[in-house]
Swiss-Prot record:
Its EC number is 6.5.1.2. The active site is at K122. It comes from Enterobacter sp. (strain 638). Keywords: DNA damage, DNA repair, DNA replication, Ligase, NAD. This is DNA ligase B.
Length: 556
């Protein structure tokens, strides 16, 4: 593991609160150069060949990570994510871009000093300028760097939904909008981004392939020096054939109204992919004053990503109740939906080894069912990769019923299991509580807590009086659970269906059962029957059963 693994400092940058690794100068140069080279390769494929080797979401997040590292180490940026090397056409009016607010409160502050506000979906595609002269579409220019772009005229003219001829005030106009992938009933929350931006870019890069352009549409979101009234703009655009703008532009006056529309467009079917919403004021400066990065009359509020790139700070190993070793990645903290995620389970040692994850790697994390974090893939591996060795595989279902230094992890896992709702239902007793109690009373085995007196509990440091009373109450209630609950607390390897069918009511009856009688229970085969016989006759288990009998537990 790196000398500085897990050590971070915080700096404020234009990218927000950046997490800065405590790297040496040499290591920082190595890591920045490696990620920069990868992003450059993706850029070349995207802009020169019209293909994407990585999803939009991963690209955006790793590009942001690179900029954070460059900011942390005062490293001159060498990669631009929009290389307009061959873009020579100047936009009549610059593309300003949009500031992205962090949430509802920042949006509320921005809206406070502005009026005549309108909300639109943030359509996910590629930006374009359309130039109409004497009623004809004479030029289409890719966004490029916001000042100059490529000549896309012939390709845009081949998009069926783009009007080639317009009338009235649009006859001499410049429009800015988004070329998007046309969709049928796209529900953003369910279907995600579909890598739409990269797909559109790929289609626009291809030469002499007009067929694919039929799958594209355009959403107009700006009309520099157009009518001052938004309703008039929308009316004129609709009459010209740009119907989507009026359909998806709504007047708003509060952040609550914006939030309502944001939720609606996230969960309802739309004809395009989106990645958030845009709020704009119809009160704009004259077009000649538009500059890249200075569009303060418009902001975006993006959707929370369904997955996030996170840096692995450390790899830890956990020994479970049955002795199985699981691997956990400790992460740089990320936000997924309403959850703050700092750890993710990688599964068994063999799965971790197959995933090949080490501290310093960047992994894509999402939420599975019931909001449980999961690893989707490794998106970037660091240069200096050192993986810790897993603990020796010496634990199994019959180890660590008794406390010892080498057994503590499995020992505490057994305590957490027996106090869980489905076993003895000792609410509020988790890993940290059991560790505190063991530190105080030096438990010999997993049932030693039964010998702790009320007087001792009332003097336990680290617990307030109400918590002490609750703890004693839970201990007392546990004593009255039926025999079957207690054998589950012991850890007997008995499936639920077999436990339900089990007709014995004492430990003696359990020990009298042979493999043949065990095999008659549902879900019990030859191997499980053998393990059950082994379990109930194990010397440690026998001693624990005897001890439970001495404590007056039913059936023992």
């Amino acid at each position: 593991m790196w000398k500085w693994a897990g050590v971070v400092v915080m700096v404020w940058s234009s990218y927000g609160t950046a997490i800065c690794p405590a790297w040496s100068h040499a290591k920082a140069e190595q890591e920045i150069a490696g990620l920069n080279a990868q992003i450059s390769r993706w850029n070349d494929a995207y802009w020169q060949e019209g293909k994407s080797d990585v999803s939009d979401e991963i690209y955006d997040q790793l590009n942001t990570r690179l900029k954070q590292w460059q900011q942390c180490f005062n490293h001159e940026p060498a990669t631009e994510d929009i290389p307009p090397a061959n873009g020579t056409l100047r936009h009549p009016f610059a593309h300003t871009g949009v500031h992205k607010v962090s949430g509802k409160e920042e949006l509320r502050q921005w809206m406070h000093s502005r009026r005549d506000l309108w909300v639109q979906p943030k359509v996910d595609g590629v930006a374009v300028t359309l130039v109409y002269r004497k009623g004809k579409l004479v030029q289409a220019i890719s966004r490029g760097d916001g000042v100059k772009g490529e000549d896309w005229t012939a390709r845009v003219q081949a998009i069926p939904s783009v009007p080639l001829n317009v009338k009235g005030v649009l006859s001499e106009s410049v429009l800015q909008g988004e070329i998007f992938l046309r969709c049928e009933r796209h529900i953003q929350q369910q279907m995600g981004g579909m890598n739409a931006r990269a797909k559109v870019a790929g289609m626009m890069m291809r030469q002499n392939n007009k067929t694919v352009l039929e799958n594209l549409g355009v959403f107009i979101w700006a009309w520099p020096d157009g009518p001052q009234s938004m309703p008039q703009r929308l009316s004129e655009l609709t009459k010209a054939g740009f119907t989507l703008t009026a359909q998806y532009t709504r007047a708003v006056s509060t952040a609550d109204e914006v939030e309502k529309n944001r939720k609606e467009w996230l969960t309802s079917s739309l004809p395009f992919v989106t990645d958030g919403i845009v709020v704009r004021s119809s009160i704009e400066p004259v077009g000649e004053q538009w500059l890249p990065g200075e569009g303060d009359w418009v902001v975006a509020w993006k959707y929370s990503p369904v997955s996030q790139v996170a840096e692995v700070n450390a790899i830890q190993f956990a020994i479970g109740r049955t002795g199985k070793i699981s691997v956990v990645a400790v992460l740089e903290s990320i936000q997924l939906d309403d959850k703050r995620v700092k750890r993710v389970n990688l599964g068994s040692v063999s799965r971790w080894q197959a995933l090949d994850i080490a501290p310093g790697d960047q992994i894509l994390v999402s939420l599975a069912g019931q909001g449980i974090p999961r690893v989707d893939k490794v998106v970037w591996r660091g240069n200096d990769r050192k993986k810790p060795a897993p603990p020796a595989s010496q634990y199994h279902s019959l180890t660590c019923f008794y406390a010892s230094p080498e057994c503590l992890e499995q020992f505490f896992a057994r305590l957490v299991w027996l106090s869980s709702k489905q076993i003895l239902n000792m609410e509020g007793l988790g890993d940290s509580s059991w560790r505190l109690l063991h530190q105080t009373y030096h438990f010999e085995h997993i049932f030693s807590w039964l010998a702790v007196t009320q007087e001792q509990i009332e003097k336990t440091s680290g617990l307030n009086p109400a918590r002490r009373l609750q703890l004693w109450h839970r201990f007392e209630l546990a004593r009255h659970h039926p025999f079957k609950k207690w054998i589950k607390a012991l850890g007997i390897p008995l499936p639920q269906a077999a436990a339900d069918a089990l007709s014995v009511h004492s430990w003696r009856q359990l020990q009298d059962k042979d493999a043949v009688s065990w095999n008659q229970l549902p879900g019990i085969g030859t191997e499980k029957a053998r393990k059950l016989v082994e379990f109930v006759h194990d010397s440690q288990i026998t001693r624990l059963a005897t001890w439970l009998g001495e404590q007056g537990i039913d059936g023992f």
